[in-house]
Design a protein with these regions (language model features):
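Juxtamembrane/disordered regions of integral membrane proteins
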Residues: 1-151
Length: 151
């Protein structure tokens, strides 16, 4: 249950960040366009895919909590912070190599519409993008760590 709650909160933080102009990054859209060029369907597919990822990561967090025989808000927050830094420093810069519809920084114009590459720390989507990603993922971890009871 807490995996679902933490994923909903993460999605809300990222969605609010985009809606309030903190970032231009639309994570469901970015993920959904991996599977379809249809921009309307991409958002729905991306939300589903991001929720599945959230549940998978929740299980990973639980496995780590169980192996450490402890869970706490600060430990979950630390894991969330590490996850966010990995997303920002590794996954987002690799998007042009992983995503069929993200152009790279060296490409010129193409006939097909391409998505802008996020760049290091997602800075191509705005200078405050790293802040929203760090806050969302750290909050995700805090919720899991605070409410998961190690048995």
């Amino acid at each position: 249950m807490w995996g679902f709650v933490s994923t909903v909160v993460l999605e809300c933080i990222l969605g609010a960040s985009q809606g309030l102009g903190v970032t231009r990054m639309n994570v469901p859209y970015l993920l959904g366009t991996i599977f379809t060029p249809n921009r309307d369907h991409a958002k729905l597919i991306g939300v589903f895919f991001h929720f599945v990822n959230g549940w998978i990561f929740s299980l990973i967090y639980v496995a780590v909590f169980q192996s450490l025989d402890r869970a706490s808000w600060w430990l979950g927050g630390l894991f969330g912070l590490v996850q966010a830094i990995f997303v920002l420093a590794v996954l987002l810069p690799l998007m042009p190599a992983l995503h069929p519809r993200v152009t790279n920084e060296q490409s010129g114009p193409t006939v097909e519409r391409q998505l802008e590459p996020p760049g290091f720390f997602g800075l191509h989507y705005g200078i405050r993008t790293p802040i929203s990603v760090l806050v969302a993922h750290t909050t995700f971890g805090i919720i899991l760590g605070a409410f998961y009871a190690v048995k």
